[in-house]
Curated annotation (Swiss-Prot):
Highest taxon in the source lineage: Viruses
Task performed by this protein: Cysteine protease that plays several role during infection including processing of the structural polyprotein or inhibition of the host immune response. Catalyzes the maturation of the pp220 and pp62 polyprotein precursors into core-shell proteins. Plays a role in the disruption of host pyroptosis via specific cleavage of gasdermin D/GSDMD. In addition, strongly decreases the host cGAS-STING signaling by targeting IKBKE via its enzymatic activity. Also impairs host FOXJ1-mediated antiviral effect via degradation of FOXJ1.
GO MF annotations in UniProt: cysteine-type endopeptidase activity
Induction, as annotated: Expressed in the late phase of the viral replicative cycle.
Protein family according to the UniProt entry: Belongs to the peptidase C63 family.
Protein EC: 3.4.22.-
InterPro entries, per database record: Papain-like_cys_pep_sf, Peptidase_C48_C, VPRT
Residues where substrate binds: Q226
Native organism: African swine fever virus (isolate Tick/Malawi/Lil 20-1/1983)
Active-site residues, Swiss-Prot/TrEMBL: H168, N187, C232
Cell location: Host cytoplasm; Virion
Keywords noted in UniProt: Host cytoplasm, Host-virus interaction, Hydrolase, Inhibition of host innate immune response by virus, Late protein, Protease, Thiol protease, Viral immunoevasion, Virion
Name the UniProt record assigns to this protein: Cysteine protease S273R
Length: 273
């Protein structure tokens, strides 16, 4: 079985909570834009996201008072480098995690952080994980601030400082399901967690030990999965997604996942246009 078959995502450009994959659009918007959708080839489009971002369609929607931006934000996957190896931005990452938080209602999506989070006020360093579990910590889902009990937590960090352009994306996943909880660090290049992350993991462990009897920290770094210069972002998101879909962390310490898998995974992450 391919590693991509172990997760529940697909190459459809629809956001994953949309069950009807024949169309990502709401019925109202489908009806209003029928003529455009039926002749999308004449617009130079091969997808619904292309149609609703076309200038002519946007102008028509504005005249009709249709909110196409809401359709894009809530019913489609995030924009991003789907069919090329462009480097992922923090927007690509955070917008993807926000959409996953709609599908996984017990997932806490934390905004990205740079590695100087101990001195810069990133959300990542302010979260109390016990409050995440109890539903006392604010998160943003579908553009709204909500509080809800979460038994999983995910964040993507960059190994550069805030003053730099960015170096390498890594993943944090906290699993508060089952009997033994875990605080996990994944680096596709196989490098060990730096000091700030080690301190963060230990602090979170102490938070969780106040409400649960068994908590461990894990550095999932014994295999160098990534050989390219471009796929650290997809690897980091893939780790979080695989763990949400109950793929064990042990898979990542026993089996190398190739860059070719990440090229394919990009089509699972982002919409077509």
């Amino acid at each position: 079985m391919s590693i991509l078959e172990k997760i529940t995502s697909s190459p459809s450009e629809c956001a994953e909570h949309i069950t009807n994959k024949d169309s990502c659009l709401s019925k109202k918007i489908q009806k209003e834009l029928t003529s455009f959708l039926q002749k999308k080839e004449t617009l130079g489009c091969d997808s619904e996201s292309c149609v609703i971002t076309h200038p002519a369609v946007k102008a028509y929607a504005q005249q009709k008072g249709l909110d196409l931006s809401k359709e894009l934000e809530t019913r489609f996957k995030a924009p991003g480098p789907r069919n090329n190896t462009g480097l992922l931005t923090n927007f690509n990452i955070d917008e993807t995690l926000q959409r996953w938080a709609i599908k996984y209602t017990k997932f806490f999506n934390c905004p990205f952080s740079m590695m100087d989070f101990e001195s810069i006020h990133y959300k990542f360093n302010q979260v109390d994980m016990a409050k995440v579990y109890k539903g006392e910590e604010l998160q943003y889902v579908e553009g709204k601030a909500v509080k809800r009990p979460c038994n999983t937590f995910g964040c993507v960090l960059n190994t550069d400082f805030s003053t730099g352009p960015g170096k390498h994306w890594v993943a944090i996943f906290v699993d508060m399901r089952g009997d033994c909880w875990s605080i996990e660090y994944f680096n596709s290049a196989g490098n060990s967690p730096p000091g700030p992350v080690i301190r963060w993991m230990e602090r979170v462990k102490q938070q969780l030990l106040k409400i649960h009897h068994t908590v461990k920290t894990l550095a999932v770094t014994n295999i160098r999965h990534q050989r390219s210069q471009t796929e650290c972002g997809p690897y980091s998101l893939f780790y979080i997604r695989a763990r949400l879909d109950n793929v064990s962390y042990t898979h990542f310490i026993s089996t190398r996942i190739t860059d070719e898998n990440m090229y394919k995974f990009r089509t699972h992450l982002f919409r077509i246009a």
